[in-house]
Amino acid sequence: MKSDSVEITTICPDVENSQFVVQSNCPETIPEILKSQNAAVNGSGIACQQRSLPRIKILGTGGTIASKAIDSSQTAGYHVDLTIQDLLDAIPDISKVCDIEYEQLCNVDSKDINEDILYKIYKGVSESLQAFDGIVITHGTDTLSETAFFIESTIDAGDVPIVFVGSMRPSTSVSADGPMNLYQAICIASNPKSRGRGVLVSLNDQISSGYYITKTNANSLDSFNVRQGYLGNFVNNEIHYYYPPVKPQGCHKFKLRVDGKHFKLPEVCILYAHQAFPPAIVNLVADKYDGIVLATMGAGSLPEEVNETCMKLSLPIVYSKRSMDGMVPIANVPKKGSKEDNLIASGYLSPEKSRILLQLCLAGNYTLEEIKHVFTGVYGG
C-alpha cells in the first residue's frame, strides 16, 4: 500500500449498516466524513463501528391485531387476547431492525377507546419522544383514524415518526395480516426517511397520513383510503416514499389541559341527516351537549327548517358530510349575517374528525371566530 493510500474493508455490501475498517498510513487523507461520532481511532487508522440500531417504543392498545378466534377461518366474533410480547413473538426478524421497548397501555376493542385511554396514548407518546427514534401504536381499525387524528392534533413530535398499525383479521386467521402490518410499521418508524412526516398509518403495504385517512370498508383487507393520496408503500422489505417529508397543511396543534389525573373533553355529538330529518332532534341534543356535528346530505345540504333551527341556537354546529369523500365549503353553510354565526363548515374533515377538532377547540375555550379559523386549515370555517 502506498504511503498516501487508503484501504477499506467491509463485511457486507450494505455500507449504511455494515461494519467496516479503514486503514491508512496517512490518517489525514481519510475523508472528513469518516471522522464522525460513529468512528473511533484504532491503531494506524480509523475503525468505523457498526451503527447502533434505532430505538423504537411500541404502545399497545388492543384491537383485531391482538385478537383470537375459535378457528382459523373465523373473521368475526373474535376477542382481544394477545399482548405486545405475543405480537412480537410472531415476527422474530424484527430484532435485526431495531431495539424495542413496549408498554401495554390497555387491551381493548377500539370501539371501547374513551377519553381516559386517549389520554394514556397521548401521555405514552409524549413521554417517549425524547428517548426513542420512533413510536408505533397498535390499535383497532374501527376508530384508528380518530385516535391518529387526535394525536396529530395534540402532539408536536418534531421529526420523530409516530406510526399507527392494526389489522383486519385476527391472529388466528389462516392468512392473518397483523404480523406483516406490525413488521412494516416498525420498519417505517425505524427508517430515517420517515422523519418529519407527522403521524403515519401503516396498513396493507400502504403508508398514509394519519390526519386524513378514513376507514372505508368494514371487512376488506384494503379497508382504509385517503383521497389526499398515499405517502408511500412497502415492497419486498423496502420503504418507498413518493414525496419528500411534509406534514398536513393547516393542522392546528392544541395544548391539552388536564385537571389532575382526570381528562375530560367537552361533549359533542354527531347527528346523521336523512330525508325528512326532523329539526326536533337538533333541539333535543342542543340542551345536553356543548357542540353538534351534522353529517349532512351532499356537501352541507339540510332541510330549510333544520337550518333555521340550527341558526337559532347559540352552540357551535359543524356541517360535515355523509359521503366518505368530498368537502363542505363555507359557501354551502347558512349564515345569520353577524359575528354570532354559529354554523361552521367542516371542509374536508369527516364527521368523526370534525367532532374531535370541535372538542379540542371547546376545551381550549376558543371563540366562534377562533373555531372557524381553525377549520379554515382544512378549507372549512
Swiss-Prot record:
Superkingdom of the source species: Eukaryota
Catalytic activity, EC: 3.5.1.1
GO cellular component, one term: cytoplasm
The family this protein is said to belong to: Belongs to the asparaginase 1 family.
Catalytic activity: L-asparagine + H2O = L-aspartate + NH4(+)
Subunit comment: Homomer.
InterPro entries given in the database record: AsnASE_II, Asp/glu_Ase-like_sf, Asparaginase/glutaminase-like, Asparaginase/glutaminase_AS1, Asparaginase/glutaminase_AS2, Asparaginase_C, L-asparaginase_C, L-asparaginase_N
Span of domain Asparaginase/glutaminase: 54-378
Source lineage: Eukaryota, Fungi, Dikarya, Ascomycota, Saccharomycotina
PANTHER family: 60 KDA LYSOPHOSPHOLIPASE (PTHR11707:SF28), L-ASPARAGINASE (PTHR11707)
Protein name: L-asparaginase 1
Keywords (A to Z) from UniProt: Cytoplasm, Hydrolase, Phosphoprotein
Binding site for substrate: 110, 141-142
Localization in the cell: Cytoplasm
Active site: 64 (o-isoaspartyl threonine intermediate)
GO biological process, one term: asparagine catabolic process
GO molecular function: asparaginase activity
Phosphoserine PTM sites in chain numbering: 350
